[in-house]
């Protein structure tokens, strides 16, 4: 402690007065108590406790000694705003002061810490918050100052925050006791404006102040402050009353003009806004100040008030701490405060210059009940977390003391002094009670009468039995027209209505202004980086889809493809990134909305994971290969996968009737027999080979002619068609084809003719196959190999039907149309292979070579423009209609891979929709009984069974009987369906 004495000369008092005059500009101290406290801190041989009212000069008690000391003084203050006010004030006095808080920039923080590490720091006073004092980042700096003996004082401002019995308890203040113990050689100074005896003892204990403590305490009585209480329930116009109070306190009533300023405290932000509007409308310029405003707006409002551009500021309790404004003429509380100490501290911000000032509290029992409820709720919440404590009652007791201050008769100054343990002061008419006790008593009695909760019954309030609070005075026919007896009878109600209307308009305009400021911000598009792997990364065709989201989806696809390669152990050396980029770009081009884009990416990822789970490599042929294949034909978007309605038309023609552009034309007997011979001699090409035709095959074979390879859910390697789940394009086209098929369903006579055509004796291909050895026919075979061009655009010139020889006419027995029979359809795979069967010998040849030597026949360019015509009443065209129906029914890819018999195509009269409805009704009881392991298996089996029923129907049985028969056969000896493999061996009904 002696080190502090060596700092000062032999006459420290003279040095103190010199600094007071030179730095702070005062000739003398404000009070003798302030001088005594300052000298005690300068001596430094005791810890000091200072309790002075707001504006009494507490800050000078430690600021002046800090300038005289050798080292640095650390000041702990609860609010950054309070710290900033103190720093700004000292900077104007050219004092080296700094603040270490979270709002400093990195450069400012670096410069401050560097100064503190110097041998002789230039900073004399360092302000910090209690959170900063306890932080680990500040400990090295603190230890450095302590080890070099550069810490002169530890000052704790607003020390009442240490006590749990105080009105503003902060848990972080409790950690300052440990900090004080580490700084044993440095004196500690604790300062507060409000301290009851209980709070004072808590401060001594929590901060570990060394006894004996030098206590300097000023009585809380301030003679220049006039306290009064107004009851809102008794005031007809509270806003007008507040306006009159403001003008009177500011001096306008004496025709001196407005002098000074005032503060009005409200409990909520909404009340601040509303009250500021009401005062402004009534002629008192006022602005709101609360935490809901932006920092720049709060600063502007505070500066306007400090410069007295705005005389009245309407604020929450956060305003005023550390504000050095001496000429505050009044402080009004629009709502009751939460404690007596809080009210005293806030009201004490008036009259710091010693001139008469006014403090008014607008009391309402409604406000009292609301605040009491909130306080008790906070206490209950704390008790749930940490249990009951004796200090929990302190908050409620502090609020009850303020309620007693308002509702009981007595001197206001005496009530405040009693609460803080001071001697009763000599008020000398310094409050409303001492000035006019009779008026205060009458107001309290009126408050008791007006309080509705205190009444036990409803009765007339006047002696004549008329109660103005009740309808028509409480009696029928009494006082009905009494209001018209006076000349100004109705003007009061009209005035109140106008005032209410004006208030509502102001409130409405304010709410509209608040909503206008909350318009949604427009999201700015962030351009991609230079190394962005995405295609069309800078495209903004999909709104609200960011480049970051696309890159995330690309990573998902790349990870899924990588896991697929690892699970299948394939030796594919292709770049996974390139594949993922192609998949992502394809999804991006197909989607129009961000949500649909993300859903499509997730679906692709799920498909890849499903393929990995089944042990099969994910094939991108359905997307990437089709794109490369579509680059060659001249019309890539024209019926890539033609539906049945376009492949088979009911338009009657002699030969090849109804084939659309791009489908397989009529084959002559020569071509048919040659292709049959080639099929019998040549080995069957391997399915799923690596080589693939560069273009799609005929629309018929792409839909039905190709035999699906075994695999999960009937997937075809290299293709995009799935068993029971066609692509969306195919679904759309099938639906359009199905509608035209339903309209063109064959009649009963045509169905009988189609049934007769199934007989082997009626098959015209039977006669063609016996003429294989004809050398003339063999010579024309090479030209017939390419007779089936791709459906994607290799079109031959218009052809004319070729005349048959007499032998061919006689074999048929009718006008010939052999290409539409089932045998001819079964011959087509050899001349027009599906896309997954790649053989070099059957590549399509140009149309001019294919049709060499044949007479052209008429064929329309656009099949969609052909009108649907009714078939001729002949046998063969009816067979064509039946073939068309069978292809449409089997369009989902459910043909049996090994079936080559004449019963391959579906029977007439059974649509897929009818079969599906019957199957679902029959299968539902089994699903409810738990016969299926999952709902997906139930749906898959129903789909499979529906296709079986459309393919075959036994004579004499209905679809329902066939479905029930197949279901009984399936569950015979099987308790439950566990996987899709269970129904792979299930065959359709037999004739």
UniProtKB/Swiss-Prot annotation:
Effect caused by changing residue 602 to D/E: Abolishes interaction with POLR2A
Keywords: ATP-binding, Cell cycle, Cell division, Cytoplasm, DNA damage, DNA repair, DNA replication, DNA-binding, Helicase, Hydrolase, Isomerase, Metal-binding, Nucleotide-binding, Nucleus, Phosphoprotein, Zinc
Effect of residue 504 to A: Abolishes interaction with POLR2A
Annotated stretches, region: Interaction with RAD51: 652-725
PROSITE patterns: DEAH_ATP_HELICASE, HELICASE_ATP_BIND_1, HELICASE_CTER
Expression across tissues: Ubiquitous.
Enzyme Commission code: 5.6.2.4
Database matches in Pfam families: DEAD, Helicase_C, RecQ5, RecQ_Zn_bind, SRI
Chain residue ranges for the region called Plays an important role in affinity and substrate choice in DNA binding: 438-609
Domain spans labelled Helicase ATP-binding: 39-213
PANTHER family: ATP-DEPENDENT DNA HELICASE Q5, DNA HELICASE RECQ FAMILY MEMBER
Top enzyme category: isomerase
GO cellular component, one term: chromosome
Description of its domains: The alpha-helix immediately C-terminal to the Zn(2+)-binding site (residues 438-453, characterized in C-terminally truncated contructs) is required for helicase activity, is positively charged, and may play a role in DNA-binding and choice of substrates.
The organism of origin for this protein: Homo sapiens
Residues bound to ATP: 26, 28, 30, 34, 53, 55-59
Effect of substituting residue 157 to A: Abolishes helicase activity
Residues modified as Phosphoserine: 488, 491, 727, 815
Name the UniProt record assigns to this protein: ATP-dependent DNA helicase Q5
GO process annotations (BP): cell division; cellular response to camptothecin; cellular response to xenobiotic stimulus; chromosome separation; DNA metabolic process; DNA repair; DNA replication; double-strand break repair via homologous recombination
Listed InterPro entries: DEAD/DEAH_box_helicase_dom, DNA/RNA_helicase_DEAH_CS, DNA_helicase_ATP-dep_RecQ, Helicase_ATP-bd, Helicase_C-like, P-loop_NTPase, RECQ5, RecQ_Zn-bd
Entry-annotated residues carrying Phosphothreonine: 839
């Amino acid at each position: 402690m002696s080190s502090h004495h060596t700092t000062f000369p032999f006459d420290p008092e003279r040095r103190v007065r010199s600094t007071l005059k030179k730095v702070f500009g005062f000739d003398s101290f404000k009070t003798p108590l302030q001088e005594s406290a300052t000298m005690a801190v300068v001596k430094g041989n005791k810890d000091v406790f200072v309790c002075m009212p707001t504006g009494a000069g507490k800050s000078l008690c430690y600021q002046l000694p800090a300038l005289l000391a050798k080292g640095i003084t650390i000041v702990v203050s609860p609010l950054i705003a309070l710290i900033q006010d103190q720093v700004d004030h000292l900077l104007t006095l050219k004092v080296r002061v700094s603040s270490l808080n979270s709002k400093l920039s990195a450069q400012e923080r670096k410069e401050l810490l560097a100064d503190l590490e110097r041998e002789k720091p230039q900073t004399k006073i360092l302000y910090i918050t209690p959170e900063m004092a306890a932080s680990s980042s500040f400990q090295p700096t603190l230890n450095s100052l302590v080890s070099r003996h550069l810490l002169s004082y530890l000052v704790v401002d607003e020390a009442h925050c240490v006590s749990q019995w105080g009105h503003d308890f902060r848990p972080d203040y409790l950690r300052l006791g440990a900090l004080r113990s580490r700084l044993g050689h440095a004196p500690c100074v604790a300062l507060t404006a409000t301290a009851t005896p209980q709070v004072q003892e808590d401060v001594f204990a929590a901060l570990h102040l060394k006894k004996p403590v030098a206590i300097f305490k000023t009585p809380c009585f301030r003679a220049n402050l006039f306290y009064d209480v107004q009851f809102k329930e008794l005031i007809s116009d509270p806003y007008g009353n507040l306006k009159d109070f403001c003008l009177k306190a500011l001096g306008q009533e004496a025709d001196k003009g407005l002098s000074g300023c005032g503060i009005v405290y409200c409990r909520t932000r909404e009340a601040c806004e509303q009250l500021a509007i009401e005062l402004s409308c009534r002629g008192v310029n006022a602005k709101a100040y609360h935490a809901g405003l932006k920092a720049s707006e709060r600063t502007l409002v505070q500066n306007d008030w400090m410069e007295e551009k705005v005389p009245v500021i309407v604020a929450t309790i956060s305003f005023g701490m550390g504000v050095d404004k001496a000429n505050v003429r009044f402080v009004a509380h629009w709502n009751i405060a939460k404690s007596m100490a809080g009210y005293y501290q806030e009201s004490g911000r008036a009259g710091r210059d010693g001139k008469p000032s006014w403090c008014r509290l607008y009391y309402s029992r409604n406000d009292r009940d609301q605040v009491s409820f909130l306080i008790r709720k906070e206490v209950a919440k704390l008790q749930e977390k940490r249990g009951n404590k004796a200090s929990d009652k302190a908050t409620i007791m502090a609020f009850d003391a303020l309620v007693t201050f308002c509702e009981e008769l007595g001197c206001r100054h005496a009530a405040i002094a009693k609460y803080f343990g001071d001697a009763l002061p000599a008020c000398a008419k310094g409050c409303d009670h001492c000035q006019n006790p009779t008026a205060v008593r009458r107001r309290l009695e009126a408050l008791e009468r007006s309080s509705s909760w205190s009444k036990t019954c409803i009765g007339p309030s006047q002696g004549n039995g008329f109660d103005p609070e009740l309808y028509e005075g409480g009696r029928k026919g009494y006082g009905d027209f009494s209001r018209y007896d006076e000349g100004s009878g109705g003007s009061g109600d009209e005035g109140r209505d106008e005032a209410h209307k004006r208030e509502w308009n102001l409130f409405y305009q304010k709410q509209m202004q608040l909503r206008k400021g909350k318009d949604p911000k427009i999201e700015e598009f962030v351009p991609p980086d230079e190394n962005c792997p995405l295609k069309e990364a800078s495209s903004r065709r999909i709104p609200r889809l960011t480049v970051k989201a696309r890159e995330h989806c690309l990573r998902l696809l790349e990870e899924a493809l990588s896991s697929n390669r690892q699970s299948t152990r394939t030796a594919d050396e292709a770049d996974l990134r390139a594949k993922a980029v192609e998949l992502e770009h394809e999804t991006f081009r197909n989607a129009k909305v961000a949500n649909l884009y993300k859903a499509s990416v997730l679906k692709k990822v799920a498909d890849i994971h499903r393929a990995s789970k089944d042990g099969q490599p994910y094939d991108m042929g359905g997307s990437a290969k089709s794109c490369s294949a579509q680059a060659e034909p001249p019309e890539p978007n024209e019926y890539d996968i033609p539906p049945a309605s376009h492949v088979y038309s009911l338009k009657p023609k002699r030969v090849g009737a109804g084939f659309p552009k791009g489908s397989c034309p009529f084959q002559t007997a020569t071509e048919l027999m040659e292709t049959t011979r080639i099929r019998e001699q040549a080995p069957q090409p391997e399915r799923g080979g690596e080589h693939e035709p560069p273009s799609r095959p005929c629309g018929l074979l792409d839909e039905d002619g190709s035999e699906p390879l075994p695999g999960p859910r009937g997937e075809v390697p290299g293709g995009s068609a799935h068993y029971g789940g066609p692509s969306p394009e195919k679904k759309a086209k099938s639906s359009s084809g199905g509608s035209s098929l339903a309209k063109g369903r064959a009649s009963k006579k045509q169905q009988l003719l189609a049934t007769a055509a199934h007989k082997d004796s009626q098959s015209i291909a039977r006669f063609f196959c016996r003429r294989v050895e004809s050398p003339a026919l063999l010579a024309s075979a090479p030209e017939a190999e390419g007779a089936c061009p791709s459906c994607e655009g290799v079109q031959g010139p218009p052809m004319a039907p070729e005349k048959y020889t007499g032998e061919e006419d006689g074999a048929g027995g009718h006008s010939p149309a052999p290409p539409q029979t089932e045998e001819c359809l079964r011959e087509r795979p050899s001349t027009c292979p599906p896309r997954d069967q790649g053989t070099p010998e059957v590549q399509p040849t140009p149309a001019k070579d294919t049709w060499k030597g044949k007479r052209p026949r008429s064929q329309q360019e656009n099949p969609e423009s052909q009108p649907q015509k009714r078939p001729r009443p002949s046998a063969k065209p009816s067979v064509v209609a039946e073939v068309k129906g069978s292809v449409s029914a089997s369009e989902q890819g459910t043909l049996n891979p090994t079936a080559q018999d004449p019963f391959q195509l579906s029977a007439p009269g059974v649509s897929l929709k009818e079969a599906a409805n019957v199957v679902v009704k029959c299968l539902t009881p089994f699903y409810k009984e738990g016969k299926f392991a999952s709902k997906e298996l139930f749906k898959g089996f129903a789909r499979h069974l529906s296709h079986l029923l459309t393919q075959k129907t036994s004579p004499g049985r209905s679809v329902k009987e066939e479905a029930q028969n197949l279901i009984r056969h399936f569950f015979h000896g099987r308790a439950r369906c566990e996987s899709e493999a269970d129904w792979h061996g299930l065959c359709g009904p037999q004739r």
